[in-house]
Each structure stands twice: as C-alpha cells, then as structure tokens.
C-alpha cells in the first residue's frame, strides 16, 4: 500500500509539538557563534550553517508528526522510538540495529556504522525506512537509498522493504526515486521564532529519556526488534574467499552475478580484489 500525506504534515502544522522539539539534541555550536558575531545572513558560512541546522529541526518535526500519524493509521503495526523517547536499555547495545550516541537509528557491525535511518516503521508485511531532507537537490539522497534498502533486505528477508521520502516543495529529481519509494512534499520550515529559540536553547543530553511516547503498543524500542544479523567484515571475507575458488579462473565472475551478491554490492560500495 501507499501511505498518503495528511494536510497537517503537508503544511507543517506544529503548534502542538513545538515544546517537544526542544527535547532533541542539536548541533548549534557553529550557528550560535555566527549569530553572536553578527555575521551577515548573506555570508556563505551563515547560509550553510543555517540550512544544516534547519535540516536538523525539520527531521525532528517530521518524526514528531509521524508519531501522531502512526496512531491514526491501523496499517502501521509498530514504529521505532528514538531521541528523547528512547529507553535507557538502548545505550547498552553496541552492534546491530540500535540507537547511537546522536540518538539516531543506525546499524552497526564491529563498531562500524553501516547505515542510518531517520525513522523506521512496520506494517503487516513490510518495513518502511524514512528519509527526510530540506535540500532541493535529491540526487545524493537517491543514491544513498540503495545501500539502506539492501541492508534492510538482508536483515529482514521475509519483509518487503519500502521507503518514505519526505522533502520540501520545489525539490528536484522526484521522478527519479525507485519504485519502492513513496515521496511526500511539505512546506518549508519557516518559523523563524522557533528556529531562533532552538538555536539558543539549553543543550540536551542524548542519553536522557525526557519525553514519554503515547501509551500504545505500536511504539517499540530498537533493542526489542528481531532481525537476521549481518556481519559486515566476516561477509566481506567470505566474498573474497569464495570468488577465488574457481578451478580455472583467478576470479569467479559468475559468483558475482547472483541476486544476493547484487545486494552486497549495494552495501560494499568499493570492493578491491588484488
């Protein structure tokens, strides 16, 4: 099925979640310093820092709106908590699907970050990963989807993997997204008072649960999810060993043409066989 955007999300109606946004951790150090120096808003350094900061807030806005959206949609069976909603048990998980130090949903293998997800939710037979961006150019985002899709396909082999992409109006390249992706378009985040308030808000510690999700069994913790482990480095070693076992050729090219290997190629962006 394809989830449809609501008017509330499309128009970024956030009056009821503004206080919640102050509970998230932000990297405001650079922007705060520029504001204190009265740096011109036309300076490249200011524009870059401001755009990045607004992108952080936008991600949290959409996440908050998706929490409410989840309660409205019977098709959504579970939604992964992160940020100020996560339980302290998540901090003891060091590998696999977890919440990292910056309160993001990531997959780690031997302390290596494989992929990061802005949000994850499950339906009866599918897993949706959510990506949010305020950049009007979507080429790099589109390119990153393949790795995320491949990883989730490996660790959740029985589920159909889909993506929900949330962008702002005026974004380009929307028709270039893969068929498994649903694209939502919202208004730009332009609440200057809110943005300024968050810039100078007291820094929040990532390891504290300061908000409580609504009492609903749909909301789940990352540490409770069952999935198939993906050992990043042992798998890489296995690929390198198997591809050399052809009786006639130094490299078995046919081995690389299997469907499973196509998923691995999306995860291992560079593979050198010397």
Predicted regions and their residues:
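Intrinsically disordered, low-complexity Ser/Thr/Pro/Gly-rich regulatory segments
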Residues: 1-274
């Amino acid at each position: 099925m394809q989830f449809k955007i609501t008017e509330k999300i499309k128009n970024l109606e956030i009056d009821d979640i503004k206080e919640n946004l102050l509970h998230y951790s932000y990297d405001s150090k650079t922007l705060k310093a520029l504001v204190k120096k009265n740096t011109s808003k036309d300076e490249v350094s200011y524009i870059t820092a401001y755009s990045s900061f607004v992108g952080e807030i936008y991600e949290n806005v959409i996440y908050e709106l998706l929490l409410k959206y989840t309660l409205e949609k019977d098709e959504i069976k579970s939604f992964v908590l992160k940020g100020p909603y996560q339980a302290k048990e998540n901090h003891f998980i060091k590998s696999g699907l977890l919440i990292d130090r910056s309160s993001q949903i990531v997959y780690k293998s031997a302390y290596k970050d494989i992929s990061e997800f802005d949000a994850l939710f499950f339906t009866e037979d599918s897993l949706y990963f959510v990506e949010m961006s305020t950049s009007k150019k979507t080429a790099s985002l589109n390119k990153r989807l393949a790795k995320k899709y491949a990883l989730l396909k490996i660790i959740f082999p029985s589920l159909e993997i889909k993506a929900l992409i949330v962008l702002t109006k005026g974004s380009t390249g929307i028709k270039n997204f893969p068929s498994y992706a649903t694209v939502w378009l919202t208004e730009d985040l332009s609440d200057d008072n809110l943005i300024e308030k968050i810039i100078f808000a007291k820094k929040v510690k990532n390891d504290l649960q300061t908000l409580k999700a609504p009492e609903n069994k749909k909301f789940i913790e990352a540490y409770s999810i069952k999935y198939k482990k993906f050992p990043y480095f042992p798998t890489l070693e296995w690929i390198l060993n198997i591809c050399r076992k052809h009786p006639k050729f130094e490299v078995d090219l046919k081995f690389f043409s299997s469907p499973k290997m196509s998923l691995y190629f999306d995860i291992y962006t560079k593979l050198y066989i010397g």
